[in-house]
Amino acid sequence: MKPSTEWWRYLAPLAVIAIIALIPVPAGLESHTWLYFAVFTGVIVGLILEPVPGAVVAMVGISIIAILSPWLLFSPEQLAQPGFKFTAKSLSWAVSGFSNSVIWLIFAAFMFGTGYEKTGLGRRIALILVKKMGHRTLFLGYAVMFSELILAPVTPSNSARGAGIIYPIIRNLPPLYQSQPNDSSSRSIGSYIMWMGIVADCVTSAIFLTAMAPNLLLIGLMKSASHATLSWGDWFLGMLPLSILLVLLVPWLAYVLYPPVLKSGDQVPRWAETELQAMGPLCSREKRMLGLMVGALVLWIFGGDYIDAAMVGYSVVALMLLLRIISWDDIVSNKAAWNVFFWLASLITLATGLNNTGFISWFGKLLAGSLSGYSPTMVMVALIVVFYLLRYFFASATAYTSALAPMMIAAALAMPEIPLPVFCLMVGAAIGLGSILTPYATGPSPIYYGSGYLPTADYWRLGAIFGLIFLVLLVITGLLWMPVVLL
């Protein structure tokens, strides 16, 4: 049990619920809608403070709403309908998130990541890139970026990708050149490599729909509010110019703005070659894994008219089991996958209720009224900038997305002139790219920050510089390119 001083984390969400519930119902809302919003806000506060795991917070919120559904979920008119059974309807709502295709897509992607890890293919790819490109420090930065880029489409946990696969490899590189943490020698090469590790993780998290769990949460929120969605291919094509630009620009930019003292050397390639020799030649399991991943990516990009992305993932997982790339025990024991599965499904359920009770449409109209007189483009850019900068106040991408994305979507829906697919993709890209702003913004951030190679002042300074560059490029490509491929 946590110390008694931590009890405020438990009480704060309840206090928020009580305070909002006691506020008079705003004009235009029904009482059950306002009470639902009170519980929803309490859940968001719980996700931020985390007195218990996020999935538990969301499940408790759903339980409260479902049990009290005659007062929180359904209107008097609905309850008065002949044959309306609120017990059955509330249960149907409570588990509705688990039938959302987004949930199964991310679960499948987690299994892909397990396959990469179990076969060693992810580590082998990173080592090959380091071996081939590690003779010059700048090229080593590109090797880190390309390693993240290859792993990102099938690793929906950026923490598992950045902190679990890439960081354990690159943390071995600086000492090869006597670049030590918490020492004046850290700037020799270690600082550049570690900054490239975290910035590459943030960039690749924005490039692919399946590179980060909050991306899929956003699509689930979008679908529940508007019945519109973005496919894997839509996201990839919409991000393509920005992706190419960032992948090519960022290693060089880091090299210029945070220059390493050591520009070249042979120790890193020799170390990578030794590690690869220890792994042995490419085995049959790795070859099968590679073939399935290429097939999945091809279908995700080009097969949207013939097969749903979630069905692609589901089928590939079945093949991975049949081909013994992973075992059934690997699936049932994957705590990270099941954790995300439950909290993501629960949050989508809660967002669906927010829309069903009429809160989203009411809030959208309220925003539209206050924003009338401004051009849709100006409003869209302003909303993206505000959403992006609010990242400073959140230490969890999940809480950040859950708290702010529904409001952003509501604002866009209230102004038909704003193209929803374009706006939502810009919001999605901002989730990943904005994670560079602080040393607490996303899972891998504290790992790289705590490596001893990135002093506090350097991290905040570089985060602000790269964050501003990312935001400017996102707005430009969002206005010029995304409408071409998404509308």
UniProtKB/Swiss-Prot annotation:
The keyword Disulfide bond does not apply. Keywords: Antiport, Cell inner membrane, Cell membrane, Membrane, Transmembrane, Transmembrane helix, Transport. InterPro entries: CitT-rel, SLC13A/DASS. One of its GO terms (cellular component) is plasma membrane. It holds the Pfam family Na_sulph_symp. It catalyses: (2R,3R)-tartrate(out) + succinate(in) = (2R,3R)-tartrate(in) + succinate(out). The keyword Cell membrane applies. GO terms for molecular function: antiporter activity. The chain crosses the membrane at residues 10-30, 33-53, 54-74, 93-113, 137-157, 189-209, 236-256, 292-312, 313-333, 340-360, 370-390, 393-413, 418-438, 465-485. It is a multi-pass membrane protein. It is found in: Cell inner membrane. PANTHER family: DICARBOXYLATE TRANSPORTER 2.1, CHLOROPLASTIC (PTHR42826). Belongs to the SLC13A/DASS transporter (TC 2.A.47) family. DIT1 subfamily. Catalyzes the uptake of tartrate in exchange for intracellular succinate. Essential for anaerobic L-tartrate fermentation. This is L-tartrate/succinate antiporter. The gene is ttdT.
